């Protein structure tokens, strides 16, 4: 990944919104950022945590999730971890609720 230690949350959100059509084409209907980058306490080596909802209930095929991750990584320069909203355990959903920033 490139040196993106100074990328702001606003820049991340803007880049995600720019590529939203390509992400939606992979079946993603909603996308939110959470974790250290959403909270504003990320380290230079922190990844980007993304929560998605998809057209179909359940998970997209793995290759589609990888494609979405690569789209995001190419746009932001950040290593990306994708979580599926439908597959999160309730305790995890509660833990990240305060961090969630809806992108689309």
Give the label of every model feature segment:
Residues 1-30, 39-40, 44, 55-104:
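Catalytic core of pol beta-like nucleotidyltransferases
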Residues 33:
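Conserved histidines in hydrophobic membrane contexts and catalytic metal-binding motifs
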Residues 36:
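P-loop (Walker A) phosphate-binding loop of NTP-binding proteins
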Residues 51-53:
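Short hydrophobic/aromatic beta-strand micro-patches
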């Amino acid at each position: 990944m490139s040196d993106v230690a100074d990328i702001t949350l606003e820049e991340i959100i803007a880049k995600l919104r720019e590529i939203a059509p390509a992400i939606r084409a992979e079946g993603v209907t909603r996308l939110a950022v959470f974790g250290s980058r959403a909270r504003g306490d990320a380290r230079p080596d922190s990844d980007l945590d993304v929560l998605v909802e998809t057209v179909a209930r359940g998970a997209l095929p793995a290759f589609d999730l990888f494609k979405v991750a690569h789209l995001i990584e190419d746009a932001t320069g950040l290593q990306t971890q994708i979580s599926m909203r439908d597959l999160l355990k309730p305790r995890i959903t509660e833990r990240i609720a305060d961090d969630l920033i809806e992108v689309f």
